[in-house]
Amino acid sequence: MNLLIMGLPGAGKGTQAEFIVKNYGVNHISTGDMFRAAMKNETEMGKLAKSFIDKGELVPDEVTNGIVKERLAQDDIKASGFLLDGYPRTIDQAHALDTMLEELGIKLDAVVNIVVNPDILVDRLSGRYICRNCGATYHKIFNPTKVEGVCDVCGSHDLYQRADDVPETVKNRLDVNIKESAPIIEHYTELGLVKNIEGEQEISQVTEDIKKVLG
């Protein structure tokens, strides 16, 4: 089985990716893992990627695409299939993936898209706060302090939010993700591959829904 998994930050993609890999025995391919392996093994594309990273420059699409193709050409993919996570990030990368899969003789079976209302994601992602005194982390919804405004660990009243976790910053980050992912989802929808999964349910129910669509 050859799959893509998509979903906005905070949608629970990582949890469901773990389930899919364990349940269906496919190879979990994340962008970060691919880059690290290619550079460690000094593949042609890995060396190219390292040259850009060492200069502090963004790795161009053709190099990223090349690293993905190197990984998809390996024997374990032919044997067990894959779950691609974190790629494609742009519509150009999606078209490049179509081409490389065709060249490798690999068929994409489904795109699992975990759908959550962005407003809910803002609450999920912007709820984190930290004790400045001891570093304990909390979440206003999922892991609140026992007494509001007081750290459970050290009793400090000095709790703060990182700039990255402020609602406005989170919303801006989600807006960028939505803009980039919308044409990719539209592309795979036209190909009849998208399986939309309601991600606002309990984690176990999201997992059950994925099992239903993948069989």
From Swiss-Prot:
AMP binds at T31, R36, E57, L58, V59, G86, Y87, P88, R89, Q93, R162, R173. Its EC number is 2.7.4.3. SUPFAM superfamilies: P-loop containing nucleoside triphosphate hydrolases. It comes from Lactococcus lactis subsp. lactis (strain IL1403). It is found in: Cytoplasm. Pathway: Purine metabolism; AMP biosynthesis via salvage pathway; AMP from ADP: step 1/1. InterPro entries: Adenyl_kin_sub, Adenylat/UMP-CMP_kin, Adenylat_kinase_CS, Adenylate_kinase_lid-dom, P-loop_NTPase. Zn(2+) binds at C131, C134, C151, C154. Catalyzes the reversible transfer of the terminal phosphate group between ATP and AMP. Plays an important role in cellular energy homeostasis and in adenine nucleotide metabolism. GO terms for biological process: AMP salvage. Keywords: ATP-binding, Cytoplasm, Kinase, Metal-binding, Nucleotide biosynthesis, Nucleotide-binding, Transferase, Zinc. Monomer. The keyword Nucleotidyltransferase does not apply. Disulfide bonds: none annotated. This is Adenylate kinase. GO terms for molecular function: adenylate kinase activity; ATP binding; zinc ion binding. The gene is adk. ATP binds at G10, A11, G12, K13, G14, T15, R128, T137, Y138, Q201. Consists of three domains, a large central CORE domain and two small peripheral domains, NMPbind and LID, which undergo movements during catalysis. The LID domain closes over the site of phosphoryl transfer upon ATP binding. Assembling and dissambling the active center during each catalytic cycle provides an effective means to prevent ATP hydrolysis. Some bacteria have evolved a zinc-coordinating structure that stabilizes the LID domain. Residues 127-165 are annotated as: LID. CDD domains: ADK (cd01428).
